[in-house]
Amino acid sequence: MNTHPELIVMLTYNDVTVPQAAEVFAKCEHTRARYWGFKEAGLPFAEMRDLFARMKACGKQTCLEVVAYTEAECLRGAEMAAACGCDFLLGTVFSEAVNAYCRAHGLLYMPFVGQVTGRPSVL
């Protein structure tokens, strides 16, 4: 059992990926932080995919957090995470369809719990 706390370094502000996410990661890629991620909003898809690839090349576990409330939006987020090669899909409201998609595509799924509203999201 891991007795050391872990954290996820999220390159976000107010539920949006910061525009300088790649530069921030480049300055910190050699740290011992294992888990890195950002939101589905804020960067063009190609930049997201490239940044996740860089993170994985550095041996990091990758997380895409999606702020979505309908099953269709949540599924689009899961598809984006899979297309980016992410390890984890964070956020969304639980959906059996999203859960099945994540299992079929090797994504670990960690949806929001409780009542979630707005953006930035309020739990």
Language-model region placement:
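Conserved anion-binding
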Residues: G59, V67, E71-L123
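Conserved N-terminal beta1-alpha1 strand-loop-helix module at the mouth
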Residues: M1-T62, E71, M80-C84
